[in-house]
């Protein structure tokens, strides 16, 4: 049996677990906050590896950013991670072999091998969390592109509302369809629509309304929250329509924390009404919020 220490590095939290070559968990998932300073984050990595290294054959990271799988570095990191993240040589963190993969690519591979898209050689996994990522399986292979940055759908331009993304570009899909995007939309509606004055959050400043406030408000039938969520949902659908028309997949799998809040059948129906290719299926990830770790572990086993 091959044992892999899999570590998922997100913008706000870091998870880790030991996984075998079948994608099965051999330990409990542990979580901690993602450090905001690069020195503290590197030390966190070292502590996790030191705690588990003797029990595993290799280490696999699933991380945001454009990953160079040949030199175990992140060539271009996300603004959600500390400055200096792309200077880390992950191979130096352990005496065991180290594999690094983009988190969305890893999630896509997990869904293809053991999750919601088994046997579907053309499928896409979209991760909806703090940001938006995409992993593309084309004819049974991961789409990487010439520089390893293929599938960065979060940077796709949509709308024309001039919203500034965390990357400082305007109108990136990520700035609309992510959890951060939902917060931006909440602020946008609060500042421009009188409906906010009658909402359950009317005593807050627009910038104080959180993603979780909106989700809670929808459950309470708060009209402001429902409008915000519907606007966010339409921005999500717009991006999915564009992706579907370009890649013609069999299935789109939705992964990440924001996926918990959507009705996949509703989204599927809306997308299929607007596309020019064959109808698609939209599913929630079966590998769950740990698909990145599973996929990274499976890919590491294939490499080593």
Identify what each model region corresponds to.
Residues 55-64, 99, 248-257, 283:
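Short glycine-rich phosphate-binding loop at a beta-alpha junction
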Residues 13, 69, 80, 249-270, ...:
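Glycine-rich phosphate-binding loops at beta-strand->alpha-helix junctions
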Residues 19, 101, 105-113, 259, ...:
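Glycine-rich phosphate-binding/hydrolytic loop that grips phosphoryl groups
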Residues 33-46, 58-59, 65-124, 264-274:
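Glycine-rich phosphate-binding loop and adjoining helix at the ATP-binding site
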Residues 118-176:
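Glycine-rich phosphate-binding loop of actin/hexokinase-like ATP-binding domains
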Residues 14, 174-241, 247-251:
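A mobile "lid/hinge" subdomain adjacent to the ATP/sugar-phosphate binding pocket shared
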Residues 4-8, 58-60, 123-127, 166, ...:
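Short glycine-aspartate micro-motif
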Residues 3-43, 73-76, 148:
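Short glycine-rich, Thr/Ser-proximal phosphate-binding strand/loop in the N-terminal lobe
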């Amino acid at each position: 049996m091959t044992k892999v220490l899999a570590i998922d590095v997100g913008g706000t939290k870091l998870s880790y677990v030991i996984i075998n070559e079948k994608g099965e968990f051999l330990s409990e998932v542990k979580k901690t906050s993602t450090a905001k300073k690069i020195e503290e984050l590197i030390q966190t990595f070292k502590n996790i590896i030191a705690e588990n290294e003797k029990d595993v054959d290799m280490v696999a990271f699933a991380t945001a950013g454009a990953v160079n799988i040949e030199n175990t570095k992140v060539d271009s990191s996300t603004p959600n991670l500390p400055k200096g993240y792309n200077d880390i040589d992950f191979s130096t963190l352990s005496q065991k072999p180290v594999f690094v993969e983009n988190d969305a690519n890893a999630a896509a591979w997990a869904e293809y091998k053991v999750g919601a898209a088994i046997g579907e050689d053309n499928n896409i996994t979209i991760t909806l969390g703090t940001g938006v990522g995409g992993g593309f399986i084309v004819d049974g292979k991961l789409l990487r592109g010439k520089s390893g940055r293929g599938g960065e759908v979060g940077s796709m331009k949509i709308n024309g509302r001039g919203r500034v993304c965390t990357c400082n570009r305007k109108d990136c899909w990520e700035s609309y369809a992510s959890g951060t995007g939902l917060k931006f939309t909440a602020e946008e509606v609060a500042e421009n629509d009188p409906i906010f004055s009658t909402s359950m959050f009317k005593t807050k400043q627009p910038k104080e309304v959180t993603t979780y406030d909106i989700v809670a408000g929808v459950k309470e039938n708060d009209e402001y929250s429902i409008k915000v969520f519907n606007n966010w949902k339409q921005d999500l659908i717009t991006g999915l329509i564009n992706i579907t028309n370009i890649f013609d997949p069999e299935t789109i799998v939705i992964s990440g924390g924001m996926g918990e809040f959507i009705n996949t059948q509703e989204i599927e129906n809306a997308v299929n009404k607007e596309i020019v290719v064959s109808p698609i299926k939209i599913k929630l990830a079966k590998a769950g919020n740990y698909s990145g770790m599973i996929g990274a572990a499976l890919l590491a086993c294939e490499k080593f």
